[in-house]
Amino acid sequence: MHSDITPIHTHKKYWAECFGTAPFLPTSRKEMDALGWDSCDIVLVTGDAYVDHPSFGMAIIGRLLEAQGFRVGIIAQPQWQDKTDFMSLGKPNLFFGVTSGNMDSMINRYTSDRKLRHDDAYTPNNEGGKRPDRATLVYSQRCREAYKDVPIVLGGIEASLRRVAHYDYWSDKVRRSVLLDAKADILLFGNAERALVEVAHRLAEGEEIAQMTNIRGTAVNLAAEPEGYTIIDSSRIEKPRKEAFIPPNPYEVETQCETKSEEPKAQPITIRPSRHDAATTAVRLPSFEKLQNDRILYAHASRILHLETNPYSGRALIQRHGNRELWVNQAPIPLTTEEMDYVFGLPYARVPHPKYGKAKIPAYDMIKTSVNIMRGCFGGCSFCSITEHEGRIIQNRSQESILTELEEIRDKVPGFTGTISDLGGPTANMYRLGCSDPKAEANCRRPSCVFPGICNKLNTDHKHTIDLYRAARQVKGVKKVMIASGVRYDLAIESPEYVKELVTHHVGGYLKIAPEHTEKGPLDLMMKPGMGTYDRFKEMFDKYSQEAGKKQYLIPYFISAHPGTTDEDMLNLALWLKKNNYECDQVQNFYPSPMCNATSMYYSETNPLKRVKYKQREDVPVAKGDRQRRLHKALLRYHDPANWPLIREALITMGKKYLIGDKPGCLVPAEDMDARTPAQRRKSGRHGANRFATKHTSTQPGFPGDKANAGSGKKPTRGGQSNSAPSRSGSATGGKHPQRSGANTGGKSSGGKNSPRAGGRNQPSRAR
C-alpha cells in the first residue's frame, strides 16, 4: 500500500544539478543572480538564523535537496507582519518548506510560567522577538498570501509534535492538528529526509501534491477515509470487539523479557503478530471535537498514538476534524548507516551565513565543535517526545564518517583550539546499541527498552562507543574530546569499561546526568530508574576519577512539578539535596510540551501508561496552580532566602514545622534569619563560602560531616563545558531533538544540544 522505500542517495538527480554546489544557499535575489539562477525550485522558510551546519535543520534540508539537484533558497527569520519577505526569492517552482526552527516557537518564546523570554539563542546577538508565536502557522499563512497556488510542506519539531489534535499548554485547551490550522498541503514528521526527497521528486515529475497520500512519515488532510484500508475504531473507551487485536500492555515488562530465564526452552519469548497487516490497517482516534471536552478520552487517545510509533508494526492513524479526515501515515523507516553518512557528509560550510557579519549566534557558538553521532532514543522518558519525533530505533553514523567530520571541524571552524565539545546525540551512550532480535524489534510496542528494567534483548555492549572515543582522540589536531550529552547511567553501569573510559578521558570536571527525582511515585511516571541505580553509577564515577587522579563531580538534574509529584515528594527531594550538599540554581519546572506522555498526564490527570477507562483508571496528582508550581520549584532551591517564606508556610501546613530552624536536620531557618545579611548568614553556618551553583558542593559548615572542610572555601576545578547547548538537528524537519517537557524557568531559550528538550535547563532538547 505504501510506496516502496528507496535509499535517499540513489534517486535520479533533478536537471538543475548542473548549477553545482553553492557556497551558501542563497538568501536574496542578489545571491541567486551570482549563482546564475533565474528562480528557486524550493524555498525554505525558518524561524532560525541560517547557519550552514548539520546541527541546524534547514541546513540539512537545504543541502540534502541541493544534492538531489534542486535549486534551494532560504528565507531565515522573515518579517511576518506582511508577505513582502516571503516574496524576496520569487515564486518557487515546486514548493515552500516551512518550519518554526530547531525549537517549538512557543517554548522558544515563553518560560514554563508562560512569561515572555527576551532572548533567543538561534538569533544573531541573542536577540528575542525575531519569530512569531506559532511560527509554523504564521509563516504558512504568509506563504499562501504571497503565492496562492504554490504547495506548502510543513516540517520541523513544532509541526511534527502537533500533527494530531493536541493539548496546548499556552492556551490551556486542545487544539486541532497544525496541518489543518495552517491550511498547508502536507506535513512531514520525524526524521523526514526520506519523505522530503520523495515529495520533491514526485512534484518535479508533475504529480499533484494532493495525490501524495501514501508516503510514510507524512500527514495529509482528506475529505474521506482512503480506500483499501481496514479501519479499527478506537475512538471510544470500551472493550474492543473480539476481532480487534489488542497487544499486551507494552508498559508492563514480563519476567522473561526482563531477565534471562534459566530454562530458555521452558519459557520462550514469542512474538504475537497482529491479525491485521500494518500496511493496510489504520486506527481511528477520537475526533478533535470529542477530545476538546473529554480529558479521560484524551488520555486514551494519547495512549493509542504512542502504541503506534514502531515504524515496522505501527499502523496509520485517522482522526476526524469537523468534516475532514486527518490521515497520519506510518512512521518513517529509520535511515541506514550509509544514508546517515550521506546526510552528514554533505558540503556544509559549518559557519553562519556571511550576511550576519560579526554578530554572535549563541546556538552556533555552543555546537560549532560538537558532532552528532546518532539519532533516536529508546529510553522512553514520559516527559520527552524523542520517540514520537526521532523514533526508538537508534540511527548510527559510521566511525569513518564521524572522524571525517572531526577533521572538517579542525580545518573549517575559525579559531578551533583542538577541543571537541561533544560526541553525542539525544544521549551520550546509545551509539550502536539496540535490539539483538530483529523480529522482536519489528513487533515491539514497549515505549522503553530500559524501564522498568533493561530488556534482555537489548545489546548494552559499549565497545563501539569506546572504540570511537579512542579513535577520536587520535585525530591529528584534536587535543581533547569532551562528552557534553547526558549520560544514560542505567546503561553505563552495564559497561564498567565505558564508565572508566569516559571518566578518565572525557570529563572536564563535571558530568551531567539526570536522575530527575528521588521518589518512586514520580520516577515510575517519568519512566526513570530509581536512586539505587544513580548510587551505583556515582560509586563507579568516584572510583575511576580517583584512579585517574582527578577531582570530578556529577551534576544531577531534577524536575519539579512533574505530574505525579506531591508536595511530600518534593520535600523529600529537597531533604535529599540538603543531605548530599547540592544547591541547584538552574531549576527545571515541568513544561508540558506537545505530544509527550507527561503532558497527557498533566492535562487529563490520568495515567495513560496504563489502560484508561472512565471508572477504572489511575488518577495522577498534578501541580497546576501557580502557587503549587512555585512551591515545588522553591523546594528545589531550598537554599535561596527568597524561597524561605513560601517553604515555611508549606512546612507548617504539612505538619513539618520541625524542619524549620538552625538544627542540622532542618531545611530552612527560622524567620529571624531573613533579616540577616548574606555575610551574617554565612557566619551563622547556614551557607558556607564554598557553595557553588548546580554543582557538587564540598561539605558545607553547619551540616553533618563538615569538620574536615568547614570554611575551606575550595571549589572543584571547573570543566570546559557549558550548561547550555543548542539542539543539533538530526531531524530533516528542522530540529535535532524533540522537546523534553522539563524546562528551565529562568527565562533562557538557549537551546539544548543534547535533546528535544525544549527550554529545559536552557537546553531545548535534552534527552535522558
UniProtKB/Swiss-Prot annotation:
[4Fe-4S] cluster binds at residues 377, 381, 384. Residues 679-689 have a biased composition (Basic residues). Residues 719-731 have a biased composition (Polar residues). The keyword Metal-binding applies. SMART domains: Elp3. Residues 674-768 are annotated as: Disordered. It holds the Pfam family DUF3362. Residues 363-640 form the Radical SAM core domain. This is UPF0313 protein VV1_2212. It comes from Vibrio vulnificus (strain CMCP6).
